[in-house]
Amino acid sequence: MNATILVKIITPLSIALEKQAKIVTMSGEEGMFGVLPSHVPMIVSLKAGLVQVYIDDMHKSENTYLISGGVTEVTANYINIATETAINVTNLSEAEIATKLLDLQKTLSDQH
């Protein structure tokens, strides 16, 4: 399967990521889900967590972002993820990502 889907992670200040991908996974309010090219259109509320962008079929994430929650719009050709905060954690260890997630969750709870 050579088809790809355009994924954008958009914050109020910038486009954090704009890339063609084979698979994108993220955390919705109902749990983790993945999106492949030609997916049925949908709009999903997202929880704070990881967005993983897979560039090839080997299931190794090329780009990983920690987001503060938000909403995603999915069509057959693109995925738009709108979020307040997107942190590129691609090159961090699992422990470093866990620490950043805890920090982000604390920041979000302090805002409410």
Swiss-Prot record:
Membrane topology value: Peripheral membrane protein
Alphabetized UniProt keyword annotations: ATP synthesis, Cell inner membrane, Cell membrane, CF(1), Hydrogen ion transport, Ion transport, Membrane, Transport
Recorded GO CC terms: plasma membrane; proton-transporting ATP synthase complex
InterPro entries xref list: ATP_synth_F1_dsu/esu, ATP_synth_F1_dsu/esu_N, ATPsynth_dsu/esu_N
Pfam family, one: ATP-synt_DE_N
Intracellular or extracellular location(s): Cell inner membrane
Gene Ontology terms, MF aspect: ATP binding; proton-transporting ATP synthase activity, rotational mechanism
Family according to the record: Belongs to the ATPase epsilon chain family.
Function: Produces ATP from ADP in the presence of a proton gradient across the membrane.
Subunit structure and binding partners: F-type ATPases have 2 components, CF(1) - the catalytic core - and CF(0) - the membrane proton channel. CF(1) has five subunits: alpha(3), beta(3), gamma(1), delta(1), epsilon(1). CF(0) has three main subunits: a, b and c.
HAMAP family in alphabetical order: ATP_synth_epsil_bac (MF_00530)
NCBIfam families: ATP_synt_epsi (TIGR01216), PRK01474.1 (NF002403)
Protein name: ATP synthase epsilon chain
